[in-house]
Swiss-Prot record:
UniProt region (Actin), positions on chain: 23-157
Positions contributing to ATP binding: 292-300, 314
Reactions this protein catalyses: L-tyrosyl-[protein] + ATP = O-phospho-L-tyrosyl-[protein] + ADP + H(+)
Protein name per UniProt: Tyrosine-protein kinase transforming protein Fgr
């Protein structure tokens, strides 16, 4: 279990407010694909829908049949499907065209508040529509979005928009594309299309390939846009749309490394956080199922939210954190939304306080490294996991936010070796006087930069120091840092410039990067942006030798 702690001396300065531009950049547009059978919804730029459910509305056939079951006037989506024997089901969309606006409004309400759990007035919305949708329907959709849900802006796109294609992964980077395509469940010829990182309005096609020399790997092709509106990879084969281009290469490789065989599989996405007015939830909405671990300030449980969403729940012991502080932290953490940060969903602010987050199936990186699966990890896999942590920290660096307790125990591992940073920001709110850099075993001295341990000067550069220690945990597969030394010895030695020796099996160039993070002058340490780039490109250049 991961300890939630804070230093009790030299309290760090309060978190500065986020700049307006940074906050504005994080307001993602919502995409809702209103299909005849299924509704798909999510955030623009995500690699998969956040919610997929049947486009149905059900009502009780007979009054009184559902007494004691929390009877409602109507049920939507999966809940309606599960009660189909005692409900009358209706489909408000036929052939992509809305035929029942009252029921359609219920589906959109369910999409915003139950599936995506967002405040619609905070997000622009992109709705897809059938090609033959009448103009009156388009106007009605827009009217409901503005008048009922108060959305700030609305755009209706044809249902054949690239956004609706299962192979379109939106705004993901080259490295993430490789991660996804090389994960289990994909074979040679698996592919995805993503936004170009370098050319606005263009796309990239990423394909999984294999050869004897390189084994499994990914090749990338730029999809260029013609001035006339068409698309091409090579000028001899031009197409009116990206969909037509993809279909062509499904039928013939025509110069590509392989035929396009299947869209890249995606992990089932975790639902993003709750609406701004729903961070405070009722304890009765959470069911604790299994204790995952115990720490000095409480337990971590596998739980269910509203009986349908798998979550991780931190139960804090009374006196650990004030209810007011827990809600303040929830509001701050809502602004920090990134694929490599564990998403906070909600809090139960009455003691014992519950902190509800997304669930990561493999638990902490530290425990995972000690298991057999972790012991079998290769150097490229370990470096990729480090790159993911650096990516999350580079985002926090851009947002002027500090972690304060970065170590393998506070990194969580999910499916396909996805790593996410947990417990960011919680350390500074814990009300416990024993968590002291000069005394008490709870303080993680071995991970803490000397200026933070001795004087409480926590900055993003002290996080960089901690990241260097985390790298040794990764390479050594869970070994405690500074083996054979106690906290006092570590502090004394580090203050005089001592560095841990190179871990067994660690390339010299990677150890060099570790040593850069341990420079005594914080300003001489590298940025997380640099560390992310270094680690992502580690096996593309000569530095690994």
């Amino acid at each position: 279990a991961r300890a939630l702690c804070r230093p009790a001396v030299c309290r760090p300065r309060p978190l500065p407010p986020l700049p307006p531009t940074a906050m504005e950049e994080e307001v993602a547009a919502l995409v809702i694909d209103n299909g005849s059978g299924m509704c798909k919804a999510g955030f623009a730029g995500d690699d998969a829908p956040r919610a997929v459910f049947p486009s149905i509305v059900g009502r009780p056939r007979h009054q009184g049949v559902m007494v004691g079951m929390g009877q409602k006037d109507s049920y939507v989506g999966d809940e309606a499907q599960s009660k189909r024997g005692i409900l009358t089901l209706k489909y408000p969309i036929e052939h992509g065209i809305v035929t029942n606006w009252d029921d359609m409004e219920k589906i959109w309400h369910h999409t915003f508040y139950n599936e995506l759990r967002v405040a619609p007035e905070e997000h622009p919305v992109l709705l897809t529509e059938a090609p033959l949708n009448p103009k009156a329907n388009r106007e009605k959709m827009t009217q409901i979005m503005f008048e009922t849900f108060n959305i700030p802006s609305n755009y209706v796109a044809p249902v054949d928009s690239i956004q609706a294609e299962e192979w379109y992964f939106g705004k993901i980077g080259r490295k993430d594309a490789e991660r996804q395509l090389l994960s289990p469940g994909n074979a040679r010829g698996a592919f995805l299309v993503r936004e170009s990182e370098t050319t606005k309005g263009a796309y990239s096609l990423s394909i999984r390939d294999w050869d004897e020399a390189r084994g499994d790997h990914v090749k990338h092709y730029k999809i260029r846009k013609l001035d006339t509106g068409g698309y091409y990879i090579t000028t001899r084969a031009q197409f009116n749309s990206v969909q037509e281009l993809v279909q062509h290469y499904v039928e013939v490789n025509d110069g590509l490394c392989h035929l396009l065989t299947a869209a890249c599989t995606t992990m089932k996405p975790q639902t993003m956080g709750l609406a701004k007015d729903a961070w405070e939830i009722s304890r009765s909405s959470i069911t604790l199922q299994r204790r995952l671990g115990t720490g000095c300030f409480g337990d971590v449980w596998l739980g269910m939210w509203n009986g349908s969403t798998k979550v991780a729940v931190k139960t804090l012991k009374p006196g650990t954190m004030s209810p007011k502080a827990s809600l303040e932290e929830a509001q701050i953490m809502k602004l920090l939304r990134h694929d490599k940060l564990v998403q906070l969903y909600a809090v139960v602010p009455e003691e014992p306080i519950y902190i509800v987050t997304e669930f990561m199936c493999h638990g902490s990186l530290l425990e995972f490294l000690k298991d057999q699966e972790g012991q079998d990890l290769t150097l490229p896999q370990l470096v990729d996991m480090a790159a993911q942590v650096a990516e999350g920290m580079a985002y926090m660096e851009r947002m002027d936010y500090i972690h304060r307790d970065l170590r393998a125990a506070n990194i969580l591992v999910g499916e396909r070796l996805v790593c996410k940073i947990a417990d960011f920001g919680l350390a500074r709110l814990i009300e416990d006087n024993e968590y002291n850099p000069r005394q008490g075993a709870k303080f993680p001295i071995k991970w803490t930069a000397p200026e933070a341990a001795l004087f409480g000067r926590f900055t993003i550069k002290s996080d960089v120091w901690s990241f260097g220690i985390l790298l040794t945990e990764l390479i050594s597969k869970g070994r405690v840092p500074y083996p054979g030394m106690n906290n006092r010895e570590v502090l004394e030695q580090v203050e005089h410039g001592y560095h841990m020796p190179c871990p067994p099996g660690c390339p010299a160039s990677l150890y060099e990067a570790m040593e850069q993070t341990w420079r005594l002058d914080p300003e001489e340490r590298p940025t997380f942006e640099y560390l992310q780039s270094f680690l992502e490109d580690y096996f593309n250049g000569p530095q690994q030798n």
